[in-house]
């Protein structure tokens, strides 16, 4: 699932192909990986704050969240619980109203979200929020959010790096969802115990923080933008990989099992 698709959509696709995941038989959260995506974004944002701002907690941290969908709103909930001060915008006014009501967030317009004097800008809407029109408005020292393809071009990543803005690469930050999908598929394997799902999933999502720290450290040491280092780390892991697990088909009998663990 992603923007514009849902679990029912994926189930419909499963009538035509076995190459799908994120379905209701695989986890107690209905197969929707967005809870894991959101928690991974929270872990990533926390790691970025620790590295850049040398802070051990998020109390009083000012965060601007662009987009309050399935992932963005859950991220806002995690941040609110951690004591952060939230500034939010969304194209759906009801989502903004809910955040104001439930999370004591401050509502701003889509145009204002970029220029706020905040610690973190968390893009959680559609792609390319960092572009020619917005990059000079940013006052945040950290960019960490769930949106895909956050940099309109690589040049924008170079600009952020040159200005000392810590950019947490998008496909690392939002990896929680695909990690969840991996373990949902793995539960279909006869040699994997579904009882391990929650523990294994949580450990891997928390591990996103360690990956980001490696990227941040190498970026600073080499004076190379984080998005470049992220690609290098990914390539290194691909090249060094030896155990390529393949799941069974979703129409196998194992796919009909029910599971008691949830994310």
Locations of regions flagged by a protein language model:
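Hydrophobic alpha-helical scaffolding
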Residues: 3, 31, 65, 69, ...
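Glycine/serine-rich phosphate-binding loop and adjoining beta1-alpha1 elements at the start
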Residues: 1-54
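Flexible, glycine/charged-enriched surface loops at secondary-structure junctions
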Residues: 1, 52-62, 89, 110, ...
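Adenosine-phosphate binding glycine-rich loop
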Residues: 141-260
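Glycine-rich phosphate/diphosphate-binding loop of Rossmann-like nucleotide-binding domains
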Residues: 32-120
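Short glycine/threonine-rich loop-to-helix capping motif typified by GTGT followed
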Residues: 70-77, 134-136, 157, 240-246
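Predominant activation on well-ordered alpha-helical scaffold segments within soluble catalytic domains
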Residues: 10-14, 38-46, 76, 93, ...
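Rossmann-like adenosine-cofactor binding region
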Residues: 60, 91-173
